[in-house]
């Protein structure tokens, strides 16, 4: 699959958002065009939907629940996560995509995540250069360490560990659909990240 970086069209409030921040978005967008980002957009964090239903899926269906610092309950309650995210007025959301032979093969699918996490790290660095403090949410559970220190000791790599978007109770499909971000389906995996900034 050919990867391309597509800026979604801005409407109304997003043009105001771009003017209201000191960040050099053109510089970030230029640098992002060198990465395998498929789609991205700048959003207002007030648009995000936080729900306990998403957290319930983590708790009842995800085998990583209560096993890493990137997952519940280590990340806090949904309300604590909401407050943490809304300390930032803006976020950059973006996706990468990769084609796999069988999307039902979880091992094959998860093996593609490392590249997205590296892209996320690079994008977070670009935003951090412009804004200072950022909060990064990305995909699935953290897999940096073979055995996570949770719950016995602090995270060994807090600067590299990105909690999962859904772990914070964020309804990723809602914000993605409202901004025209596509989840293609079939055997195409869409990885999704948010970089919050002020």
Regions found by a protein language model. Name each.
Residues 10-22:
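Short, Lys/Arg-enriched N-terminal segments with co-localized hydrophobic residues
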Residues 21-27, 103-104:
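Short, conserved charged micro-motifs
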Residues 26-41:
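N-terminal domain-onset segments
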Residues 38-68, 72-198:
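Catalytic cores of enzyme domains
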């Amino acid at each position: 699959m050919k990867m391309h970086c597509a800026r979604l069209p801005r409407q109304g409030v997003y043009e105001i958002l771009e003017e209201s921040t000191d960040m050099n978005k053109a510089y970030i967008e230029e640098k992002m065009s060198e990465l395998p980002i498929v789609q991205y957009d700048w959003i207002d964090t007030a648009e995000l939907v936080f729900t306990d239903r998403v957290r319930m899926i983590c708790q009842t269906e995800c085998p990583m629940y209560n096993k890493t610092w990137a997952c519940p309950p280590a990340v806090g309650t949904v309300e604590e996560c909401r407050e943490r995210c809304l300390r930032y007025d803006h976020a950059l959301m973006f996706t990468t995509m990769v084609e796999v032979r069988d999307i039902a093969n979880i091992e094959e699918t998860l093996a593609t995540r490392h590249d997205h996490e590296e892209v996320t790290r690079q994008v977070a660095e670009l935003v951090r250069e412009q804004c200072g403090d950022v909060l990064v949410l990305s995909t699935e559970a953290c897999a940096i360490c073979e055995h996570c220190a949770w719950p016995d000791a602090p995270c060994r790599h807090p600067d590299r560990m990105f909690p999962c978007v859904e772990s914070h109770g964020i309804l990723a499909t809602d914000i993605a659909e409202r901004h025209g971000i596509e989840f293609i389906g079939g055997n195409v995996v869409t990885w999704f990240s948010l970089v919050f900034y002020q």
